[in-house]
Regions:
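Catalytic cores and adjacent flexible loops of soluble metabolic enzymes
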Residues: 1-323
């Protein structure tokens, strides 16, 4: 089993913390360590999210004002030099360095920093121009699928089959944190018709659920598991509550070495009723997932000029516009 330790912004923009996180992920048994190429300069100003929208007591758009989000992201950025040093350091401890690309304009920059393995967030699974460019430029893609409609996923798989040197599809649920009864882990087997390797990106609440969702995913055939990773107290970072430690990684890897029958027996003994996580292989996105998709899909784009942040001045990841 491959384990991707997702550092996200749990490093708080501090490269010394990044290196310590890499060390602990390696000690836990991770195979991959991932950062995110999130840059405030790529954040689009969209008026509908400044105050959010409620109609007849129903949320139509979440509230996420641009300026506070810009300021927050700006303080979490790693420099280009630090990203290149991240690649070198992860490789020096024998693991695979990864990053998530959030804007088409960053593809070449990421390649120049030495990355060869890329994660595509589920909100960009249907950003077909960027997906194609990433597939052509890098050696391997891990593509999350949680916020993607089935017709979009089928087309994404066609793009990957045609252009990618290698790829995996990851099931996830874009609800943070994800309740166990909303996991729909049967989706993992369903994804195997579109990829030779499938996996799971887990967003469950660690303090409540531990590693049960990830273990159940492995018992359902996940060959890759991705989880947010931290060395800090969960209260210190935005993603802390859904982030695990090296001890959690070890427990999952030990579990993955059991036979499938023993895995299910352990789940039944330690987590009676775990089958509630299986859910449906084919399903519609929940209202919460649709609201998150509405905000996060199109959150980042490539500015047409320095300092631009309005929609008309940005190239979206799903636009065929040449950069």
């Amino acid at each position: 089993m491959k384990f991707i330790a997702e550092l996200c912004q749990n490093h708080n923009g501090n490269f010394d913390t990044v290196r310590r996180m890499v060390d602990e992920a390696a000690e836990g048994g991770a195979s991959h360590v991932k950062i995110q190429h999130i840059y405030a300069r790529n954040l689009i100003y969209r008026p509908e999210f400044e105050e959010g929208l409620e109609q007849n007591g129903e949320t139509k758009a979440i509230r996420r004002p641009w300026q506070p989000e810009y300021d927050r992201l700006k303080g979490l950025e790693l420099s280009e030099d630090e990203c290149a040093r991240f690649v070198e350091y992860v490789e020096s401890v024998g693991l695979v360095p990864m990053t998530t690309c959030f804007a088409r304009g960053d593809v070449e920059r990421i390649a120049q920093q030495g990355f060869r393995t890329i994660k595509v967030a589920s909100y960009d699974c249907a950003s077909f121009p960027m997906l194609r460019e990433l597939a052509q430029r890098f050696d391997y893609l891990y593509v999350s699928t949680g916020a993607t409609f089935d017709d979009e996923l089928r087309h994404a798989a066609d793009v990957l089959r045609k252009h990618a040197k290698g790829y995996s599809l990851l099931h996830c649920v874009t609800q943070y944190p994800t309740p166990l009864d909303a996991m729909h882990l049967n989706r993992i087997g369903w994804l195997s018709q579109y990829a030779d390797e499938v996996g799971f990106s887990d967003h469950s609440l660690v303090s409540r659920d531990g590693m049960v969702a990830a273990k159940a995913a492995v018992a359902c055939g996940a060959e890759v598991v991705e989880r947010h990773f931290t060395i800090s107290d969960p209260s210190e970072t935005k993603d802390g509550p859904v982030s695990i430690t090296k001890e959690h990684i070890r427990s999952l890897i030990d579990f993955s070495r059991l036979s499938r029958a023993d895995q299910r027996a352990q789940l039944t003994e330690e987590h009676p009723g775990w089958e509630e996580m299986l859910g449906k292989a084919e399903r519609w996105l929940s209202d919460t997932e649709l609201l998150n998709r509405d905000y996060y899909r199109g959150r980042f784009a490539t500015p047409r000029r320095e300092g631009a942040n309005r929609l008309a001045e940005m190239v979206l990841n799903w636009e065929e516009t040449p950069l």
